[in-house]
Regions:
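N-terminal beta-strand motif that seeds the catalytic metal site of vicinal oxygen chelate
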Residues: 1-19, 78-80, 132-137
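Vicinal oxygen chelate
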Residues: 3, 93-137
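Short hydrophobic/aromatic beta-strand micro-patches
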Residues: 13, 81-85, 119
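Core segments of cupin and vicinal oxygen chelate
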Residues: 13-59
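Helix N-cap motif at beta-to-alpha junctions
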Residues: 16-17, 85-89
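Short amphipathic alpha-helices within nucleic acid-binding modules
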Residues: 23, 88-95
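Helix-adjacent hinge/juxtasegments
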Residues: 55, 60-78, 83
Length: 137
């Protein structure tokens, strides 16, 4: 069987594209890769891309010079987790506090990892997790 290399893109659907973009760039420090009226793309860790789509803007086929992208969308609070270094967990907690982002939950995992949870401006659950969460991370 051919193998999959990684999850390349993760998509969240947002009501206010500018507000969400500011949160992911200014609060989480993600580097913008692409912007248009329908979506924003951010680099995550040099190998992954976070896509923010304006909710409802992708319900029709998207025609590109090289082909088409089928319709997609999402609703309700979704979840995304970002990996962080264990020794940066306290710094992340301080950064979120300074940015007035409330931490909703904390988890210590059986494998030794730690997670903190908070919401983005659209109510999506964002997790920052250290190694020791999964057998592969």
């Amino acid at each position: 069987m051919p193998r999959l290399d990684r999850v390349l893109e993760t998509a969240l659907y947002v009501d206010d594209l500018e507000r969400a973009s500011r949160f992911y760039a200014d609060v989480l420090g993600l580097r913008p890769l692409f912007a248009d009226p329908r979506l924003r793309a951010f680099a995550v860790g040099g190998q992954n891309v976070l896509l923010l789509f304006r909710r409802g803007a992708s319900l029709e086929v998207t025609r590109m010079p090289g082909g088409t992208i089928p319709p997609h969308d999402g609703s309700g609070p979704l979840h995304v987790a970002f990996g962080i270094e264990r020794d940066e967990l306290t710094a992340w907690e301080a950064r979120l506090s300074a940015q007035k982002v409330a931490i909703e939950g904390r988890t210590d995992w059986p494998r030794g990892g730690h997670s903190i949870y908070f919401r983005d401006p659209d109510g999506h659950l964002v997790e920052l997790a250290t190694r020791g969460l999964w057998e592969i991370y």
